[in-house]
Amino acid sequence: VGKGVDITAEFAVTQDHQGAPGLAHGGLLSLAFDEALGKLMWLLRAPAVTARLEIDFLKPVPIGTKLYITARITGKVSRKVYSEAEGRLGGPDGEVVVRAASLFVIVPMNHFLENAPADYLEELRKNPDVLRFVDPEFEINP
């Protein structure tokens, strides 16, 4: 977790993430950024969904490197949360090779539970504090 409403993550780029020979697949990098930006919602304790995700691939990301992703919230208007991120090679202060911008929309917790598998719901019933971390008012079958 970063200093304010921001986070820093390390993404190890392995052979499993390869697209073109020796390089990370852009779709998998997009996934990593969506996850990092989505984790910002935990800092707000607000369940949310990705409404928009824009990625700028500035330089190739080689297999065997570590991508340092820093994400921050840049604004909030009602249920809309705006955020940005960048990915750097060579360390947290290294060269920026990927940039992202996103819009998340805060939704009720039930949005996630309506299609959840039965075993997932059962696990939540056993451990309700998992959801209370995000939404302190939420209860399963109150």
Give names to the regions the model predicted.
Residues T8-T14, G27-L29, M109-H111, N115-P117:
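Charged, low-complexity, helix/coiled-coil-prone segments
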Residues K3-A9, G27, V49-L53, L67, ...:
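A generic structural signal for short beta-strands and their flanking turns/coil linkers
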Residues E10-A12, E54-D56, T70-R72, E86-R88, ...:
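Residue-level recognition of well-ordered beta-strand positions that form the cores
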